[in-house]
Structure formats: C-alpha cells, structure tokens
Swiss-Prot record:
Residue ranges occupied by any PABS domain in the UniProt entry: 4-238
GO terms classed as biological process: spermidine biosynthetic process
GO cellular component: cytosol
Superkingdom as given in the UniProt entry: Bacteria
Protein name: Polyamine aminopropyltransferase
Keyword terms of this UniProt record: Cytoplasm, Polyamine biosynthesis, Spermidine biosynthesis, Transferase
UniProt source species: Ruegeria sp. (strain TM1040)
Main location: cytoplasm
Amino acid sequence: MTKEVWNTERLHDHFAQSLRVSEMYYDSKTEHQRLKVFQNGTFGRVLTLDDVVQTTEGDNFIYHEMLTHVPILAHGAAKRVLIIGGGDGGIAREVLKHASVEHVTMVEIDAGVVDFSKEYLPMLSQGAFDDARLNLVINDGAVFMKETEDKFDVIIVDSTDPIGPGEVLFTDTFYGHAARALTEDGIIVTQNGVPFMQGDELTNTMRAFQALFQDATCYLATIPTYVGGPMALGWGSHSTKARSVDLTTLEARFAAAGLSPDYYTPEVHKAAFALPGYVKKLFP
C-alpha cells in the first residue's frame, strides 16, 4: 500500500494546513527558497515556497483578478504598470488582458521561479511572458524600487509573506520609494495576508500608507488556500478619485475592456472595500 504524502504549511502559530500530494512534479532548492510543484485532487497543481502555498491552479483566479482589475479599472487610464514579484506570471496574465495597458515592468528576485513556472505552471501565465509589452527584470524589488526613475500608473506588489526575501517589500522605506514612483493619480496595491491570522501585516502597511498617501485603505478577497478568512489587499493613492468611482462608471470600463473574469465584477469591486469591524480595528 502506497503511503500518503502531504504538504504541511506551518505559516501561523498553533495552526497548520495540509494538502495531499498525489504527484510531485518539482522539488528543488533555489538560491533563495525551496520550491515545490505538486498535484492535489481539489486544487490541481500547487506551488509552494518553503512549504507555504503561493498559488494553485484551482483558486489563483480570485487573487490575481482582484489584485489586478480593481486598481486598473478604478484608475481608468492606466498605461504603465509595475509588478513587484509575481514570478508565476498570474498577475502579468491579468494585467495584459487590458489592451489599454501599453507597458508592463515585472521585477522578480528569483529567476528560478520564472523558469519553472513556465515549465510546470504554464496555465498560470498563459503566454504572458511572451507578450511584447512585458519587460521582465530579475532583481530585488526593493533595490529596483529605490533606483527606478520611471513613473507608473499602477504598482502591484505580489509578494510572498514578510519573511525571508519578501520581508523588504513590507518596509516603510520600500513603500516610500513606491509612492515616489507613482503618477499623480497612480495606485499601489499590496498583498497583506489574512487579517485574522496576520493582523500586524495590515497594521504596519496601513501605518506606512497613511503617512504617504491621501487615500489609504484595504479591500478584501477570499481565497480558499489562503486560510483564515478574507485576505487584505492594501490600497494607496495620492488621490481619492480612483476609489470613489461610481458603479456605473466601473461597469462601463469593465464592458469596454472586454474582460470575462471568474471572480471580479464591478459589484464585487465596490463591495470589497466594505470592511468588517475586526479589520477596521487593525488600522492605526
């Protein structure tokens, strides 16, 4: 009888999440972290970094759509987009669905993530790495953000959790450089974990955003493999204009974009900014 193999994630104290591994496709250590890709009966192919689930074939659409379409459609005229992280290509996939976006810069610290994602998780990028509008830069996102002189309409920080190489993407210094790199009406969105489990992540980001941006808040999306309730996606902008866009305008922009997402709708977009009390209490 074959012994069952499980991948167990222990990101949070006093709590673990296990996914059954029906087939292991990839298991190797890069310079920065241990990467695995395996098959799970519920979620399809699963990508983990140091055993922590990063994305899955089954539920990635929720995270990638909400981190992308919310800022781009709220902005309404985004032409230049910066992605920090996102080596699996899922964010790039969604950004490049917007024909109005002319140039995408994607900064990924680990070339190994990109290479094996192309080979083992092609369903995530769906050819995004071959799009002529995408400029892939292998560099530390914090270093790039400090040194860039370019301006961006939307900055999407698709980071890992604030441990290891992803830690610098949660600092006040990084956010300060990002604020400088935004256009006048630009928007930054960030991955800030699950507030019920990782409240400090949201508190620290909101403290930094409140000092840097006229509009600083978060919005929510529930992704099954990011356990503990809704995930917080940070939102910062030098203007309140984007977040106050009415539903009719969003619906018109959505229709013009010709999108057919599986999670995002203009109604979900507006509702995502309605925050429960326990999340509001995490704001400084």
